[in-house]
Structures are given as structure tokens and as C-alpha cells.
UniProtKB/Swiss-Prot annotation:
Gene name per UniProt: nadD
Principal EC category: transferase
Name of the protein this chain belongs to: Probable nicotinate-nucleotide adenylyltransferase
Family: Belongs to the NadD family.
Enzymatic reactions: nicotinate beta-D-ribonucleotide + ATP + H(+) = deamido-NAD(+) + diphosphate
Pathway it works in: Cofactor biosynthesis; NAD(+) biosynthesis; deamido-NAD(+) from nicotinate D-ribonucleotide: step 1/1
Length: 213
């Protein structure tokens, strides 16, 4: 049986413990040995990043330098176009072949808006969705047809993620950290401490670069 590979996308502006710690727990829960972080260059669903792509790449490299679970994929940073998950997963599937189990990790907030994503219906053709639960978010989609879509693909058996190459949605019980990039940027702008929110090398780099001031 080929091992499950997971992709974790985001803006990472900046990367922080709220990104890393839930995924580390997730890896232990479901048996992931490698998580590929894929920062996006031009996110289509949110405001554009304050740090440029080179700076965000460096912050990620610093954050995962001593974490063998994580590796970095720069393909979306090299595109001068919107970063569409559907497109990236098609490429990833072509590279890995038809039989390797692949998964894309998202937060529960992203699941609720998932049907607005570009070609969202193709994503489960190429990967599973692993959803990190977040308190305060509903478990139901806004419209009945999307709720049916969720129920059609939902599994409560994590073994399905390893045995099938794609097509399942799994809700993972991961810890939630009340940390966001917005909170960090606001604290930095106000001259407040962020030592408890992100890795020390990342904070040092932010200060050296004068970011988020």
C-alpha cells in the first residue's frame, strides 16, 4: 500500500503556530509521514498578502527547518496568476500517478465556502479533503445540494484515506489555537509581543525585514 501524501495550502502571511501545530497533531492521528506546504502567490479568495512571495517563502523555510514532517513546494509562488487549488491538485495527481492516496488539508471555515472555489467539483477527483475542525463553525453547508455533496463523500474511517486514492472528506479532531495572521499583524503594528504565536526564527526575520509595521 502506498503511503498517504498530504498537501497544505495557504497564504502564510506570516506562518504561525495555528498553522503548524494542528497539522502536526493531524499527522500523528492519521499516520502522515510527510506534509507538503504550498504557499500561494495570488490567493483568489482573500486580500493579497502584505509580505511578498520571497519573504513568505523564507518565513516558511525558517519555520520548518527542524521539522522533518514538512516540505515546501514553490509551484504556486512561481505562477504570476491566481493560485487555484484545483489546478495544483491536477498537476500533483499527474506527477504522483493514479494510485497514490493524496489529501488536501483545509480548515472547517474553508469547507463551508468550498463550493465557491474554482472547479471545486474536480478537487475530490484528485485528492481527499481532510478538514481540521474549528469550534464555533457549523457542520452543515449553507445549501441543501452542497450538504448532500458533503454527505456523499464524508467518511468517519481514516483508513479510507489510506486505501483509496481520492474522493473522501474526513473531519479530523485537531486542537484549535486562537491565532491568526491578522492578530499577529495587528500586534506587530501595535508593538506588542508575538513570541507565543509563531516560531522565534520567523519573528526574528519579520523584525529584520521590518514587516507588518
Amino acid at each position: 500500500m502506498k503511503s498517504l501524501q498530504a498537501l497544505f495550502g495557504g497564504t502564510f502571511d506570516p506562518v504561525h503556530y495555528g498553522h503548524l501545530k494542528p497539522v502536526e497533531t493531524l499527522a500523528n492521528l492519521i499516520g502522515l509521514t510527510r506534509v507538503t506546504i504550498i504557499p500561494n502567490n495570488v490567493p483568489p479568495h482573500r486580500p493579497q498578502p502584505e509580505a511578498n512571495s520571497v519573504q513568505r517563502k523564507h518565513m516558511l523555510e525558517l519555520a520548518i527547518a527542524n521539522k522533518p514532517l514538512f516540505t515546501l513546494d514553490e509551484r504556486e509562488l512561481k505562477r504570476n496568476a491566481p493560485s487555484y487549488t484545483a489546478q495544483t491538485l491536477k498537476e500533483w495527481r499527474q506527477e504522483q500517478g493514479p494510485d497514490v492516496p493524496l489529501a488536501f488539508i483545509i480548515g472547517q471555515d474553508s469547507l463551508l465556502t468550498f463550493p465557491t472555489w474554482y472547479e471545486y467539483e474536480t478537487i475530490l477527483d484528485n485528492a481527499h479533503l481532510i478538514v481540521c475542525r474549528r469550534p464555533g463553525y457549523p457542520l452543515e453547508m449553507a445549501q441543501p445540494q452542497y450538504q448532500q455533496w458533503l454527505e456523499d463523500h464524508l467518511t468517519h474511517n481514516q483508513e479510507d484515506l489510506h486505501l483509496q486514492p481520492a474522493g473522501k472528506i474526513y473531519l479530523a479532531e485537531t486542537p484549535w489555537f486562537n491565532i491568526s495572521a491578522t492578530i499577529i499583524r495587528e500586534r506587530l503594528q501595535n508593538g506588542e509581543s508575538c513570541e507565543d504565536l509563531l516560531p522565534e526564527p520567523v519573528l526574528t526575520y519579520i523584525n529584520q525585514q521590518g514587516l507588518y509595521r
